[in-house]
Amino acid sequence: MSDNSQKKVIVGMSGGVDSSVSAYLLQQQGYQVAGLFMKNWEEDDDEEYCSAATDLADAQAVCDKLGMELHTVNFAAEYWDNVFELFLAEYKAGRTPNPDILCNKEIKFKAFLEFAAEDLGADYIATGHYVRRQDVDGKSRLLRGLDGNKDQSYFLYTLSHEQIAQSLFPVGELEKPEVRRIAEQLDLVTAKKKDSTGICFIGERKFRDFLGRYLPAQPGPIMTVDGQLVGKHQGLMYHTLGQRKGLGIGGTKEGGDDPWYVVDKDLDSNTLLVAQGHEHPRLMSVGLVAQQLHWVDRQPVTAPFRCVVKTRYRQQDIPCTVTPLDDERVDVRFDDPVAAVTPGQSAVFYQGEICLGGGIIEQRYPLTNPA
């Protein structure tokens, strides 16, 4: 008998392939496994309702196939209060938040973890995230997933070592093609299902239309960094630094046909600033200040240290020096300038495979100060 046979694991079943295979792998490891489908959004239209109903049906079909129970829970109120309202407030303030990080912090590894432990008697929860856990000296570390293309540690940096100690990540040890292969061998309904993109639980939809339901559009001018009016935007909230598509402006006689990129947002004048070329000096930063820090080991940083940072998901590692400003903020200086560092997004720090933690980008240090 496996030592795991007395341990109960609740898997967050999303109706996708990663959580499906996670449940199977845990069964193979000898755990008592059940699923939990979380409903975190009250749908507004038929299309959304259909998508959520399909996900639930797929999760149920997988659980039936694997011979395990599926529980359901509604966290829509928690999601609205702790994720969505903050998400809207950030957009209103001209920043670009990452709702998936908030959702993991408030829902998947808080509300779900508490519900699984208290209501379902779970010893552990499990998710289909591509990350790994390593236990060293009685503390759990968060490691990058084995599949570098799929590593999701960027989204989980807010977790504490205590939360990680109660969590299992079976597919973090595998590469994505292997996960699909296992699902196909088991003839799971999710084997060929497309990976979900879009906002956490809100799903795939036209982002501009969605945001427009909750925040009124505030049109304003699009200006070049040289002060030339080149167009009109429908609202600063629809744009993010480094964005190229959806600006509705072509080349100019002076600038030729190089594409335009968003390089700044002036909230006071409701102006979107653009420049041509993805390495325009105004788009580059030499560092940043991060706030709302979360360190996985929960030890405050007291001295400068070297590491690498990511300022967005799937970005190349950026070598940097991190210096504490106070308990809540750090100063980060890159070895080389970096494009499109975006306030509101997260800066996540690593040493080798270990995810140390991270924070929200409060401000960036531009390569060139505006005249």
Swiss-Prot record:
Pfam families: tRNA_Me_trans, tRNA_Me_trans_C, tRNA_Me_trans_M. The active site is at 103 (nucleophile), 200 (cysteine persulfide intermediate). One of its GO terms (molecular function) is tRNA-uridine 2-sulfurtransferase activity. Residues 150-152, 312-313 are annotated as: Interaction with tRNA. It catalyses: S-sulfanyl-L-cysteinyl-[protein] + uridine(34) in tRNA + AH2 + ATP = 2-thiouridine(34) in tRNA + L-cysteinyl-[protein] + A + AMP + diphosphate + H(+). Disulfide bonds join 103-200. ATP binds at residues 12-19, 38, 128. It is found in: Cytoplasm. Belongs to the MnmA/TRMU family. Interacts with TusE. This is tRNA-specific 2-thiouridylase MnmA.
